Amino acid sequence: MEDCIKRNQTKKIKVGDIFIGGDSPISVQSMTNTDTRDVKATIHQIKSLEEAGCDIVRLAILDNEAATAIGEIKKHVKIPLVADIHYDYRLAVECMKNGVDKIRLNPGNIGGNDRVRTVAGMAKERGIPIRIGVNSGSVEKRILEKFGGVTAEGMVESALAHVAMLENVDFNDIAISIKASSVPMTIAAYRLLSEKCLYPLHVGVTEAGTVYKGTIKSAVGIGCLLAEGIGDTIRVSLTGDPVEEIKVGKQILKSLDLLKEGIEIVSCPTCGRTQVNLIDIANSIEPLLEKLNKNIKVAIMGCAVNGPGEAKDADIGIAGGVNEVLLFKKGRIIRKIPQENVVEELIKEISEM
């Protein structure tokens, strides 16, 4: 299939063993919602994120105890860790001493140039990148006054001012995020930023909301930018289990053909032609397919109109009949299956592929 999306070429940086930017695959990030000082709970959550396919995880660093906990956490997990730092540059230093893979901070918020130079110097020495993260709710007062409130242009100016502070101390291992809770403002800000710099962009919609509404806002905002070639790593922000962020993030990438792994499920919305309980069948099959390590396309169709004809590009699928379904592969009908056996039989067929 022709690649319809041409990604912007950005500078490539390395976070642990993951590359961001350039021709690197778009990575999916999350953030723990445990107290980082609770090492056991934090490790448990990170392992759940690893299992879900998370590439990079960020942790809140509230104090020195949280910073030193990074060292113990690193011993038990595989994915790169990002320290989320606000105001106190000493916490960034302590995290780097304990092996963190990346720092998220805004240099304008940690004090004078000496402090910026200290953090940037240590990060450069250890090969640790820094992400500048501008959010609409934390734009500097002078910029708010200049632009008359929060604007995409103001957020970009803020981000580039922080970038300049790092560049002025000869640090260029930088990623940038520039998020708003407003989807249109987020899109406008990233579009503008992508025209002004070549640093890799961490894309997301901040404070997106609960799982349902946040998924929609994130899919629209992140999806729009990725479709334009903007974005090198993504984070879906949801009020809920961080594992859900990974599921949504990966599905956004799959929807744009930017991630080609795992089972892709296509299913019809059903209509009056459907003679089997396709909704229950689809809902029963989906979680079972998530456990199978296959790179295939599975079609779950309600009738012979939608499948196998319209779904003939699927590797395998079913099409509803009267109290039974047709099993097909690449558009070719294999056999009929009673409705009550369809889930078991389809999973068995897929497992053997």
Swiss-Prot record:
<feature type="binding site">
    <location>
        <position position="310"/>
    </location>
    <ligand>
        <name>[4Fe-4S] cluster</name>
    </ligand>
</feature>
<keyword id="KW-0004">4Fe-4S</keyword>
<protein>
    <recommendedName>
        <fullName>4-hydroxy-3-methylbut-2-en-1-yl diphosphate synthase (flavodoxin)</fullName>
        <ecNumber>1.17.7.3</ecNumber>
    </recommendedName>
</protein>
<keyword id="KW-0408">Iron</keyword>
<dbReference type="InterPro" id="IPR011005">
    <property type="entry name" value="Dihydropteroate_synth-like_sf"/>
</dbReference>
<comment type="pathway">
    <text>Isoprenoid biosynthesis; isopentenyl diphosphate biosynthesis via DXP pathway; isopentenyl diphosphate from 1-deoxy-D-xylulose 5-phosphate: step 5/6.</text>
</comment>
<dbReference type="GO" id="GO:0046429">
    <property type="term" value="F:4-hydroxy-3-methylbut-2-en-1-yl diphosphate synthase activity (ferredoxin)"/>
</dbReference>
<keyword id="KW-0411">Iron-sulfur</keyword>
<keyword id="KW-0414">Isoprene biosynthesis</keyword>
<dbReference type="InterPro" id="IPR016425">
    <property type="entry name" value="IspG_bac"/>
</dbReference>
<dbReference type="InterPro" id="IPR004588">
    <property type="entry name" value="IspG_bac-typ"/>
</dbReference>
<dbReference type="GO" id="GO:0005506">
    <property type="term" value="F:iron ion binding"/>
</dbReference>
<feature type="binding site">
    <location>
        <position position="271"/>
    </location>
    <ligand>
        <name>[4Fe-4S] cluster</name>
    </ligand>
</feature>
<dbReference type="GO" id="GO:0016114">
    <property type="term" value="P:terpenoid biosynthetic process"/>
</dbReference>
<dbReference type="GO" id="GO:0019288">
    <property type="term" value="P:isopentenyl diphosphate biosynthetic process, methylerythritol 4-phosphate pathway"/>
</dbReference>
<dbReference type="InterPro" id="IPR045854">
    <property type="entry name" value="NO2/SO3_Rdtase_4Fe4S_sf"/>
</dbReference>
<dbReference type="GO" id="GO:0051539">
    <property type="term" value="F:4 iron, 4 sulfur cluster binding"/>
</dbReference>
<comment type="similarity">
    <text>Belongs to the IspG family.</text>
</comment>
<comment type="function">
    <text>Converts 2C-methyl-D-erythritol 2,4-cyclodiphosphate (ME-2,4cPP) into 1-hydroxy-2-methyl-2-(E)-butenyl 4-diphosphate.</text>
</comment>
<keyword id="KW-0560">Oxidoreductase</keyword>
<feature type="binding site">
    <location>
        <position position="268"/>
    </location>
    <ligand>
        <name>[4Fe-4S] cluster</name>
    </ligand>
</feature>
<keyword id="KW-0479">Metal-binding</keyword>
<feature type="binding site">
    <location>
        <position position="303"/>
    </location>
    <ligand>
        <name>[4Fe-4S] cluster</name>
    </ligand>
</feature>
<dbReference type="Pfam" id="PF04551">
    <property type="entry name" value="GcpE"/>
</dbReference>
<dbReference type="GO" id="GO:0141197">
    <property type="term" value="F:4-hydroxy-3-methylbut-2-enyl-diphosphate synthase activity (flavodoxin)"/>
</dbReference>
